[in-house]
Amino acid sequence: MSGWPRIYYKLLNLPLSILVKSKSIPADPAPELGLDTSRPIMYVLPYNSKADLLTLRAQCLAHDLPDPLEPLEIDGTLLPRYVFIHGGPRVFTYYTPKEESIKLFHDYLDLHRSNPNLDVQMVPVSVMFGRAPGREKGEVNPPLRMLNGVQKFFAVLWLGRDSFVRFSPSVSLRRMADEHGTDKTIAQKLARVARMHFARQRLAAVGPRLPARQDLFNKLLASRAIAKAVEDEARSKKISHEKAQQNAIALMEEIAANFSYEMIRLTDRILGFTWNRLYQGINVHNAERVRQLAHDGHELVYVPCHRSHMDYLLLSYVLYHQGLVPPHIAAGINLNFWPAGPIFRRLGAFFIRRTFKGNKLYSTVFREYLGELFSRGYSVEYFVEGGRSRTGRLLDPKTGTLSMTIQAMLRGGTRPITLIPIYIGYEHVMEVGTYAKELRGATKEKESLPQMLRGLSKLRNLGQGYVNFGEPMPLMTYLNQHVPDWRESIDPIEAVRPAWLTPTVNNIAADLMVRINNAGAANAMNLCCTALLASRQRSLTREQLTEQLNCYLDLMRNVPYSTDSTVPSASASELIDHALQMNKFEVEKDTIGDIIILPREQAVLMTYYRNNIAHMLVLPSLMAAIVTQHRHISRDVLMEHVNVLYPMLKAELFLRWDRDELPDVIDALANEMQRQGLITLQDDELHINPVHSRTLQLLAAGARETLQRYAITFWLLSANPSINRGTLEKESRTVAQRLSVLHGINAPEFFDKAVFSSLVLTLRDEGYISDSGDAEPAETMKVYQLLAELITSDVRLTIESATQGEG
C-alpha cells in the first residue's frame, strides 16, 4: 500500500486509536483457533467499513497476525489480504466492493489450481460496535447491518470502547479447491456461505430483539394455560376475574426480567474496573465450544455450580467478553431487595421463589414465562443446586427448573435446547466465613442493602477466578437415546408430566453434576489447603509443601481427572508464593527454613477450598490410604476394597467413572504413584516406599474424614440392623459431632445433614438397607471391618464406645 491510501488510513487511524478500544474474541486468536502464521492468511469481513478494517488491523498487530493492509504476494501476484462480502461507501476504488468480492475469491481459488503446495487460510472476522439487540417494535435490522458514514461515526464515537473483533476458525482454501473445484460458482457459494456465517454470528453475539415488557405480559395473559389458571384462581379464592388477572400480572411483575443493554454496558465498565483490582486474573476454558453452539442456533441453558453471589456477575461478564449474549438468570427472590433487585432485573435476572407449593397460579405463570424465554430464543441460566454450596462440594440437584425446561421442549419448539454445565472456582469466596457459621447452626442472615455493603467493604485481593465450560448436553439427543418416544408427549398448549419425566429429569440432573465436576479447576489455594489440612498439625515446611504439591500436580497432569478439568501450569513453588499472597497462611522462619502454617481459626474456612477439588483427588487418596494401612497389597485385593467403597464416593462427590472403568483408572494411578516413587510394584503387589512415606500419608489423609464418616454409619447399622433411615441419619450426625470435638476435625461438612442423607440413600440403592429399614448385619459388618482397618484406633474406639454409651 502506498501513496494516498497510506496517508488516508494514517489520518483515519488517529481518531480511531483514541476512540476505539476493542477486545479480541478469542483473547489469543492464533493458538486458540489453530492459525498457522507461517502460511498465508487472508481476512473476510462482512461489509465495507474502513473503521472495521483499521480496528481489525490493530488487533492483528497486537496478536502477531499479518497486517490486513499489506497485500499478499503469491507466485508474483499481489492480492488484497482482505475481502468485504458487502459493498459500501468507498474512497478508493482499489478496494473491493461486493461485486468484486466474488472475483477476489475466484482469484485466490485459481492460484490454488496452479500451485498444488499453496494453502491460504481464510479467516472470517466480524467487528461489532455495540451489541444492542433493539426492541421488537423498532425498525428491523437486516442480518448484516451496514452503516453509512455518519451512522458509523456516531457508532464509533459512542460505542468505540464497547467494540469486539471476533475471529472465527479458518477455512482452508486448499481443501475448498480440492473438494469443490475453483470455478466462479464455487467463489459465489463461498461468498454466500460467508454471508450466512456473519448473520448467524451477529445473532449469537447480540441475541433476539427484546419485547416491550407490557406486550410480553399481554401475550402471557392470552395463553390458554394462564387463562385457565386465572379462572381457577378466581373460583378457588372467590374473587372476580379482573382481580385474579391482576394477581397474575403482579406475579409477572415479580418474576420477569427487564433486560437493558445500556445497563449491561455500564455494568461491564464497572465490573471491568472492579475485576482488575480485585482479581489477579479470570481464567476461562472451553468457551469456543459454547460459541459454536450459539452460532449453530442452539438454545443455550447455562447450568453453573453455585459458590457465591458473585457467580451471577462473573458468568455474565465472562459470557459477554466471549462474544455471547448475557443470559436471563433465575435468581432467588431473596435478592429482590432495593437497589440490587432492580439492577439485577435490568441485567437479565428473573426471580424465583424457594417453593411453588400451594400456589398454582404462580407455578403456571413462572412456567409460561420460562417457556416464552425459550421460544423467543433467549439464553437462560439457572443454578441446578438451588442455592449456594456452604461446604465447597456440589449439593444434590434441585430439579424443578430443569423439569420446566424439558416441559418447554414438550411444547414443540423447533430450536434445540442444549444444557451447558459450568464449573466456577475462586481462590477467595467472600461469604465463606458466613457459610462456616451457618453450618455450625447460625441462622442465615437475610440479604439486604446493609449486608451487601458490609460484604463489598471486605473485598480485597480475591486471587484468580475460574470459569470452565463442561461438556454440553443436547437435550434432544439425550431424549432420543433414553426416551425414544418422547415426541408422543408433545402438547403445544398444556404443560404435560408424562410418566418418564421425573426419572429422566433426575438422571439428567445427576449427569449435569458429574459434568460440572469434570470441568473442575485446581488452583494454588485449593491445592495448598488440601496439603496443609492433610497434616495433623496443619503445618508443613516449605520443602514438604512443595513436595506434596508436586505429588498432586503430577497425578492431575499425568492421570487427568477428565479432559475438561484444568491444572495450573505454574510450578509448585510458584503456586505456594501465590497462595501466600492471599494472606490465609502464616510463615514462621527459623535457621533451617520456612514453616507454612494454616492458623486454627482459618482451618475451618479453608476446608471450603479443599472441598472444591476433593473429587479430583479422592481416588488416589483412597488408594494411598489402603496401601499405607496394609503396607503391601495385591492389585486384586486393592480393587476389591475400592469397589466396595466406590458407590458411596461416586454418589457423594459426583464422580465420573462407572464401576467397569475403575480397573483401568486404578492401574493408571498405581503406575503414576510408582513413577513418583510413592510405592513400588513387585509381582503385581503394591508396596509402600519408606523414602516417600510422608507424601503418601498426606495423600491418604485426603480420604481420612470421608472414611471416618462411612465407618460411623456402617457401625451404627451393624450394631442395630433394624434402625430406620431417619434415625440412622440423626445418630450418624450425633456421633460425627462427637468425633469432631474429641479428635479436632475442623471440616464443617463432617457432620452436615445433607452428606449423611445422601449416604443413607446410597446404602439403600446398593442394597445394604431395604425400604423397610432392615439391614443385612453380615454385609454391613464386613464393610465396617474394611473401614475400621483404614481409620486410626483412637477414632475407631470413639465410634464404637459412643454407640455402646447410648445403649
UniProtKB/Swiss-Prot annotation:
A motif (HXXXXD motif) lies at residues 306-311. It is found in: Cell inner membrane. It is a peripheral membrane protein. It catalyses: sn-glycerol 3-phosphate + an acyl-CoA = a 1-acyl-sn-glycero-3-phosphate + CoA. It is an enzyme of class 2 (transferase). Pfam families: Acyltransferase (PF01553), GPAT_C (PF19277). Keywords: Acyltransferase, Cell inner membrane, Cell membrane, Lipid biosynthesis, Lipid metabolism, Membrane, Phospholipid biosynthesis, Phospholipid metabolism, Transferase. SMART domains: PlsC. One of its GO terms (biological process) is fatty acid metabolic process. Pathway: Phospholipid metabolism; CDP-diacylglycerol biosynthesis; CDP-diacylglycerol from sn-glycerol 3-phosphate: step 1/3. It comes from the Bacteria. GO terms for molecular function: glycerol-3-phosphate O-acyltransferase activity. One of its GO terms (cellular component) is plasma membrane. Its EC number is 2.3.1.15. InterPro entries: GPAT/DHAPAT, GPAT/DHAPAT_C, GPAT/DHAPAT_LPLAT, GPAT_PlsB, Plipid/glycerol_acylTrfase. Disulfide bonds: none annotated. Belongs to the GPAT/DAPAT family. The HXXXXD motif is essential for acyltransferase activity and may constitute the binding site for the phosphate moiety of the glycerol-3-phosphate. This is Glycerol-3-phosphate acyltransferase. It comes from Escherichia coli O157:H7. The gene is plsB.
